[in-house]
Regions:
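Short Gly/Pro-enriched turn/cap motifs at secondary-structure boundaries
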Residues: 46-47, 107-110, 165-168
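Pseudouridine synthases involved in rRNA/tRNA modification
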Residues: 135, 143-221
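Non-catalytic RNA-recognition surface used by pseudouridine synthases
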Residues: 90, 99-100, 109-121
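RNA pseudouridine synthases
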Residues: 1-99, 170, 200, 206-220
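Conserved hydrophobic positions within beta-strands
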Residues: 80, 117-120, 153
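Short histidine-centered loop motifs in beta-beta connectors
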Residues: 125-126, 130-133
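Short Pro/Gly-enriched beta-strand edge/turn motifs at strand-loop
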Residues: 99-102, 113, 156-162
Length: 221
């Protein structure tokens, strides 16, 4: 196997930090792989914030990691404040660091090109459910983009959302799909390649909406 998909709960950091040195997805992965007699090296293809829930794709070797990174497609569900028109939309706005902030990002003319495509599925009682495809992968992209149009994610107090109805940003990575790398034996090892689309075996993994986001929608929509 070249990859594994993990379903991360909210409030769990992906990597160890000064504030969260032990209880992380990376440490849990390493312990599980060691128990199975496999390499404990954690190679996440995508990363999600500590309070974001959902799928994290990890490569099981260093050869597969860049191939998977180039062809993975992700779908997120976000509950945003305010009622947006039903249907499809695009937020295409550059994102950069907030001045004098280590964590915060913002839409700024000198930021990196950033594009989020979304579909508003439901909108009622002051909330909207959006299915989001981050075409680019900037830090906090979905959070920053919706905040920039006046509709921050519910619970996202870093970008103007309110925590009276949910205790974290209402964002969940619900689906990932990727083409499985092919390999060819060569002298001294193997060569991994991303197959052309018409010959590819595509894997799609889905994660249901977590309980706190379901409760938010059930209560308000």
């Amino acid at each position: 196997a070249f990859a594994i998909v993990l379903d991360k709960p909210p409030h769990l950091a992906v990597h160890p930090t000064l504030n969260y040195p032990l209880d992380t997805l990376a440490n849990g992965y390493a312990a599980r792989m060691e128990a199975r007699g496999e390499s404990p090296v954690f190679r996440p293809v995508n990363r999600i914030d500590k309070d974001t829930s959902g799928l994290v794709l990890a490569a099981k070797n260093g050869y597969a990691a860049p191939l998977l990174a180039r062809n993975v497609e992700k779908l997120y569900y976000a509950v945003v404040e305010g009622e947006l028109p039903l249907g499809k939309g695009v937020i295409d706005a550059p994102i950069g660091r907030q001045a004098e902030s280590i964590i915060g990002r913002c839409v700024t003319p000198d930021g990196k090109p950033s594009r989020t495509e979304y579909t508003i599925i439901r909108a009622e009682h002051g909330l909207s459910l959006a299915a989001c495809v981050p075409v680019t992968g900037r830090t906090h992209q979905i959070r920053v983009h919706f905040a920039s149009i006046g509709h921050p994610l519910a619970g996202d107090d870093l970008y103007g959302g309110h925590r009276d109805r949910i205790a974290r940003q209402a964002l969940h990575c619900a689906r990932q799909s990727f083409r499985v790398p092919t390999y060819t034996e060569v002298p001294g090892g193997i060569r991994l390649e991303t197959p052309v689309e018409e010959h590819a075996h595509t894997v799609a993994v889905e994660s249901p909406l977590p309980e706190d986001m379901r409760a938010l929608l059930d209560a308000e929509i």
